[in-house]
């Protein structure tokens, strides 16, 4: 099969076979036989949607009025596929789905019916990812809290596979709620090797009471960039505003005016010049310290060697001292100092990973390993880069160091590269994956008018874990495949329908 083709013409499915499939499907739905559609799909290696399509085609070409002879099973099942696809893939509101179904002649199209269908399907799904019996995976927990109006939602994801491990609505955000949350994940086979989260009180206490033997990595984005980024923008805006005022004063000065007013105008212009210079210097000083602190988060130096954690912490502390004394930023500095002890914990994880790599691959060229480390680091920066220019620069550096690594590691370079990157990806600096998932989930919450239910969250989690990526490095893979290493042969919608039919049966 050509991997690039999503659909292919099945020449082995003759007209007679298609007619047989359609007839059996119509009969099964008329008799309300559960599981027949799924069995037909399995027996003939086709999708359930294709089975319904054949059944509909037979009814139309035979000019049979389904309502006169059979219950409206085909329309109902077909509308269910539409409901699930529109809600999860299209992120449509229930009201919009109702309008769509009415337009295309589906009888059961009321808001109440759609809500009932979504609730029924969500009720048969767990809110925790489930592995096969006795199967376990060791992963990083990236945990955070999101909100739907007053409802708190706890979510934990695997930052490497992007799979949602658990999502649940809770009454209160307490340490006990987080402990129960993590216990359930662990009971289902996902063993934590470290925890990445922000500085939430309940999260910190939950870690202390339940996961104290694991490293807790504070989110580096929330630790520095989130705190100081807004100040960087503010200082820059102040500088540009001052430049604009100076320019306006200069225009007035160069225009014709009474000599009696000239002295006052000159004085005002000189004040504008002085103010502009002060604002520019303030911005440049702050920006230099801000960028210096961000650079201290790098794991590897310019030669690809692991940086010293103590030196990095000392440099950040020196920058904080200057921000406090010279620029007088008291509160932001205090906030960063509060979490500084946990901010660079990933250095310890990186140290262990590099040691394990040298044990697993004793013959690896050390220069080549350093080049791979730099390529990996520039790849991470490329993902984080916001400006196209910055992104291009990072991409060029990434390619350069991969090429350099290949010069040192000529033999089985692809295999060595994949192994090294797999290990390095376990170094997690932030819980940005949860922020990303939050941005994906937010449209569902908004289209629900924030009347979110656990059943809806179960559906969203199932879809996000089993839908296939269509671009970037995870292209053609699903989060669940990446988490478990097991191939997923079916579409998420077929899997969901089968799961529903099995549970109902």
Regions found by a protein language model. Give the residues of each.
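Basic, short loop/linker segments at the boundary and entry of helix-turn-helix/winged-helix-like folds
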Residues: 3-24, 41-88, 136
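Mobile genetic element proteins and their domesticated derivatives, centered on retroelements
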Residues: 21, 40, 51-54, 83, ...
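Short, charged amphipathic recognition helices of the HTH superfamily
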Residues: 28-42, 89-102
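Short, basic interhelical loop/turn and adjoining N-cap
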Residues: 36-54, 102-113
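RNase H-like nuclease fold core
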Residues: 67-85, 89-96, 103-214, 230, ...
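Charged, amphipathic alpha-helical linkers/stalks
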Residues: 220-307
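C-terminal domain-tail junction helix/linker
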Residues: 277-307, 368-390, 397-416, 420-431, ...
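Short amphipathic alpha-helical "interface-anchor" segments enriched in bulky aromatics
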Residues: 426-453
């Amino acid at each position: 099969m050509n991997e690039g083709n999503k659909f292919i013409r099945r020449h082995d499915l003759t007209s007679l076979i298609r007619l047989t499939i359609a007839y059996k499907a119509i009969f099964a739905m008329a008799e309300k036989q559960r599981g027949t559609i799924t069995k037909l799909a399995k027996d003939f290696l086709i999708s359930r949607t294709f089975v319904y399509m054949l059944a509909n085609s037979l009814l139309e070409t035979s000019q049979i009025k389904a309502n006169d002879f059979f219950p409206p099973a085909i329309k109902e099942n077909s509308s269910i596929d539409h409901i699930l696809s529109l809600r999860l893939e299209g992120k449509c509101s229930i009201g919009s789905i109702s309008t769509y179904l009415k337009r295309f002649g589906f009888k059961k199209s009321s808001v109440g019916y759609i809500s009932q269908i979504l609730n029924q399907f969500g009720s048969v799904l767990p809110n925790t990812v489930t592995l096969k019996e006795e199967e376990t995976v060791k992963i990083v927990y990236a945990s955070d809290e999101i909100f739907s109006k007053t409802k708190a939602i706890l979510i934990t994801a695997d930052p490497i596979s992007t799979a949602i491990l658990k999502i649940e609505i809770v009454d209160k955000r307490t340490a006990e709620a987080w402990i129960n949350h993590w216990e359930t994940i662990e009971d289902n086979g996902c063993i934590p090797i470290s925890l990445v989260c922000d500085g939430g009180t309940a999260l910190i206490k939950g870690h202390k009471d339940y996961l104290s033997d694991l490293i807790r990595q504070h989110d580096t984005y929330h630790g520095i960039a989130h705190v100081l980024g807004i100040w960087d923008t503010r200082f820059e805006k102040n500088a540009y505003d001052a430049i604009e005022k100076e320019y306006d004063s200069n225009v007035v000065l160069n225009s014709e005016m009474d000599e009696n007013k000239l002295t006052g105008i000159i004085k005002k212009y000189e004040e504008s010049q002085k103010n502009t210079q002060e604002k520019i210097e303030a911005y440049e000083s702050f920006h230099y310290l801000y960028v210096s602190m961000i650079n201290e988060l790098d794991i590897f130096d310019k030669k690809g060697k692991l940086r010293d954690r103590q030196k990095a912490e000392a440099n950040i502390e020196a920058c904080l001292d200057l921000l406090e004394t010279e620029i007088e930023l008291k509160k932001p500095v205090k906030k960063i100092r509060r979490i500084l002890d946990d901010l660079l914990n990933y250095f310890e994880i990186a140290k262990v990973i590099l040691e394990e790599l040298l044990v697993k691959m004793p013959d690896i060229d050390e220069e080549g390993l350093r080049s791979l480390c730099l390529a990996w680091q520039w790849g991470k920066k490329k993902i984080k880069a916001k400006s196209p220019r910055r992104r291009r620069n990072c991409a060029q550096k990434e390619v350069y160091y991969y090429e350099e690594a290949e010069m040192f590691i000529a033999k089985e370079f692809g295999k060595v590269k994949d192994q090294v990157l797999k290990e390095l990806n376990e170094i997690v600096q932030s819980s940005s994956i949860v922020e990303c998932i939050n941005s994906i989930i937010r449209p569902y919450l908004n289209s629900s008018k924030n009347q979110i239910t656990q059943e809806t969250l179960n559906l969203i989690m199932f879809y996000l874990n089993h839908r296939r990526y269509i671009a970037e490095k995870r292209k053609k893979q699903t989060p669940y495949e990446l988490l478990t290493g097991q191939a997923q042969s079916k579409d998420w919608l077929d899997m969901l329908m089968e799961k529903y039919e099995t549970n109902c049966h």
